[in-house]
Design a protein with these regions (language model features):
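Start-transfer (signal-anchor) and selected internal transmembrane alpha helices
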Residues: 1-44, 557-558
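Cytoplasmic membrane-interface segments at the C-terminal ends of transmembrane helices
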Residues: 22-23, 114-128, 161-169, 193-211, ...
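Transmembrane signal-anchor helices characteristic of membrane glycosylation enzymes that use polyprenol
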Residues: 27-56, 221-222, 323-328
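Membrane-embedded helix bundles of polyisoprenyl
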Residues: 39, 110-119, 127-167, 171-199, ...
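Active-site lumenal/periplasmic loops and adjacent helix-entry segments of GT-C-fold
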Residues: 43-130, 134-154, 184, 342, ...
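Transmembrane catalytic cores of multi-pass membrane glycosyltransferases
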Residues: 51-58, 62, 69, 73, ...
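Signature aromatic-anchored transmembrane alpha helix within multi-pass, membrane-resident enzymes
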Residues: 309-328
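Extracytoplasmic
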Residues: 330-558
Length: 558
């Protein structure tokens, strides 16, 4: 489509490159709305007619927890205790509670497609058209992964870049803050994009100072939150995934080399490659999550190729094929995996829930052999049954690391792990297991685990742990008499120091006695006199300041 000149008395809105806009606003708006409509329609089909995404179960449970208990800092029903929302998403679950997971997902997909189209059209004009449309298609498919907070954060990040294009710094600041509140990972990727732009436009330094200051301030705020609510977990990052990132970034940088209009894109590839190498070298809760840019690999590749007019064509075809594979492979895997999971209905889990309600006491928790769809992490804790695991892989490390061992799972190490976490029963289903649960399922099915099968239905089996160790152990008889999301009550017959198999946090407070962390990160409770002791999570300024300073707050009560 030829360019249509526009005569106007007003200066055009500034783009990131500070060059005049080359297309009419009406043309940009029309294409953006069409892209948003297409993305929203496709997302609607996938979210309502397709299988639930791989992460859908996690968000379903977290939304339930928010509806039932509000914004809690802690949850005892996953991973022997963990921080709930504060370092993951501050605003997604309140929004999901109001609008529902599926409707919110469709809305955020449509908004992202709208903003992406506007941003690229303002920056690159008609050359961005095919990139806009491929984004509308592939971004809608992200609902198959169930990465809904990330999708929300990405929509807000794109709106932030749009605000920056129009020169509205205060809107950019607000939207950048909302991006961080929706998804720290989306904020991190926004930082990479802006860093690439900043390097490419370094001659416009003064214009970049305010946006850079905003990003640094928000990044500092996120770092403080992670310091205050550190969980010590890490997310794996395989060398195979790193290799795929490297190929994508090196190819992208090569294709945009000496293409002046693609200068911001070239530096994005370089900055992103450096960030991924750092994430691989430094174990953290980020890990492989840093490669989420793969979900837009196709539109990014199409943009890079369009800016060089798809020359040479053989190289362009190979590049697009590689980008398509990297973009769509995890989505296709998630689609197939969740389509084969029969465990998404509550009726599937009801026999196990009924049995556990009749036999499990508060002094023990349950291990559910994780399924491909992770629905055990929804229906069992919803029923008030505390789990040794859940669905937030970062929290599997280090306490559940042995389940990921490449050397198989032995009977002795498995029993020791079950005893260390106060597990009384193990639930095994006929649903396809998660990759981290294959060795565990195989051991149980072999009959050599040392556990006794105590219940079996068409889909579910329950095994009893021999000589189970309760959640609380110490010098005298003791029991857990009450357990909720952020509170636990124990009864001890003798004074002394007890081990409580719940993860320590500096925000735990006991009604009487003293709290300390053990070497295994579990609570050590010093009880001065026999009786009941209630532990609850209390987040206040004094404890937060001490946690930030790396000091243990005074945790003794009279």
């Amino acid at each position: 489509m030829p360019e249509i000149p526009v005569t106007t008395s007003k200066a055009p809105p500034p783009s990131l490159s500070c060059r005049p806009v080359h297309v009419r606003t009406s043309t940009v708006a029309r294409e953006a709305v069409l892209c948003a409509a297409a993305a929203g329609f496709l997302a609607s089909l996938l979210v309502w007619l397709g299988p639930p995404g791989a992460d859908f179960a996690a968000h379903a449970y977290q939304r339930t927890a928010f509806l039932q208990h509000g914004f809690g800092f802690w949850n005892n029903f996953w991973y022997a205790g963990r921080y709930s929302f504060v370092t993951y998403s501050l605003i997604y679950y309140p929004l999901a509670a109001v609008f529902g997971i599926k409707l919110l997902a469709v809305f955020t997909i449509a908004i992202a497609a709208l903003a992406f189209s506007v941003v690229l059209s303002h920056e690159w004009g008609p050359a961005a058209r095919w990139s806009n449309w491929t984004f509308a298609v592939v971004w809608a498919c992200i609902v198959v992964s169930g990465a809904f907070p990330f999708a929300l954060g990405s929509a807000l990040a794109l709106l932030a870049i749009w605000a920056l294009q129009t020169g509205s710094r205060w809107k950019f600041g607000v939207l950048a803050a909302l991006t961080a509140a929706a998804s720290p990972l989306s904020f991190l990727l926004l930082s990479f994009v802006l860093a690439g732009i900043g390097v490419a436009r370094w001659r416009e330094g003064r214009k970049l100072l305010v946006p850079a200051a905003i990003i640094v301030a928000m990044g500092g705020t996120e770092a403080v939150l992670w310091r205050l609510f550190a969980d010590g977990g890490r997310y794996p990052f395989s060398w195979q995934e790193l290799l795929a990132v490297c190929v994508f970034c090196v190819l992208g940088a090569a294709l945009t080399w000496r293409v002046e209009r693609a200068r911001p894109l070239r530096w994005l590839f370089i900055v992103y490659l450096g960030a991924c190498l750092a994430a691989f070298a430094i174990p953290s809760s980020l890990g492989e999550n840093v490669d989420r840019l793969r979900y837009v690999a196709v539109p990014v590749a199409v943009l890079a190729l369009s800016l060089r007019q798809w020359r040479p064509l053989p190289v362009a075809v190979v590049t697009l094929a590689l980008a398509t594979s990297w973009n769509l492979t995890p989505l296709a895997f998630s689609f197939v995996k969740t389509s084969e999971d029969p465990a998404s209905a509550q009726a599937y889990w009801q026999p196990a829930i009924n049995y556990l309600h009749g036999h499990l006491t508060p002094s023990y928790r349950v291990e559910a052999v994780d399924t491909a769809g992770h629905w055990d992490a929804v229906y069992l804790p919803r029923a008030g049954i505390p789990l040794a695991r859940g669905w937030f892989r970062q929290n599997d490390y280090p306490q559940n690391r042995l389940l990921y061992s490449d050397d198989g799972l032995g009977r002795g190490s498995y029993l020791a792990w079950l005893h260390s976490l106060g597990i009384r029963y193990v639930v095994l289903t006929d649903a396809p297991p998660d990759y981290s649960a294959r060795a565990e399922a195989k051991l149980l099915q072999s009959g050599r685990s040392g556990l006794t099968q105590v219940m079996k239905t068409k889909h579910v089996s329950i095994y009893s742990v021999p000589s189970p160790t309760p959640l609380i152990t110490g010098p005298g008889p003791a029991a857990v008499v009450g357990l909720s999301e952020s509170q636990v009550t124990v009864r001890a017959a003798e004074a002394g120091t007890y081990r409580l198999a719940i993860r320590y946090s500096p925000y735990w407070q006991a009604s009487t006695g003293c709290l300390d962390p053990g070497k295994d990160s579990m609570i050590r409770l010093r009880i001065p006199v026999p009786g009941n002791v209630t532990l609850s999570i209390h987040v206040n300024a004094r404890r937060a300041l001490m946690a930030f300073a790396g000091e243990r707050p005074q945790t003794c009560s009279r």
